[in-house]
């Protein structure tokens, strides 16, 4: 099982898709859609010995440091790593990557770094100077012999549908592992049918070009880890039925700052998705199936249901959700 440990809800960035949108969405009556639990503290108060006992009950645990920005809690990271010997991963904005000593970094076998493509796109989404700072820090940890996998974690905004150009830029500067997600359906106020319809058309065309590029790379015996493609291809080749690909609520959970476990870190405040606590048995944590809205979909087990948070809260109208689904159906048909 994978466990995202939310070390803090604080962040040292104010990204447009996260901070800015959350401020605009504050009065969107979200409490009418879900029962909220906002009781957990800002920074992690979990007892490391209790965490160690819980993790020991799992045969194949992986800990993922998460936030907010996890590197704002470097001492907590060190405390956990000094006491628990398991595989580690981390999702970070990369601004403080140079602050964690290399002996700890090298025990983190995958680091997902938030970067959206070229300098203009990244700085527009995440603030001026972000791109240069993040790339400098990545260079520093490589120079210090970081031996793990660095994954570019992109957020694709409606203003930037050309995933092809942005992914090729990241490849050109040294990334061979890339993941992305469309910023769509996560806030109640930002749906614009005309703009998003145009985005989907341009995005799907760009994805088709990117798949052609990826397949040509494979033919030339170079397999780029474009994770959204890898998952679909693996399912098609192995006739595999996939649940939510992120693992939320079946093979992955988040540990809140108060020690409660939830199905997914981005819904840590939704009471319905509290699944247990550090006294629970991992095998007995509450599980969440693919959403009912997906039951009659022909690619249900290829897509896996896209996102538990999105399908549960239904913040966009159904027309908007259908457009989101079309981006996945189009990707599957091209592959």
Describe these PLM feature segments:
Residues 1-46:
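Canonical Radical SAM [4Fe-4S] cluster-binding loop centered on the CxxxCxxC motif
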Residues 10, 14, 18-21, 267, ...:
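Cys/His-rich metal-chelating microdomains
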Residues 27-29, 35, 128-135, 139, ...:
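Radical SAM enzyme [4Fe-4S]-AdoMet core and its adjacent flexible, acidic
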Residues 31-36, 310-326:
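Short cysteine/histidine-rich metal-coordination sites, predominantly Zn2+-binding motifs
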Residues 48-64, 73-183, 192, 196-198:
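Radical SAM/AdoMet-radical enzyme domain recognition
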Residues 334-335:
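Conserved small/polar residues in nucleotide/adenosyl-binding loops
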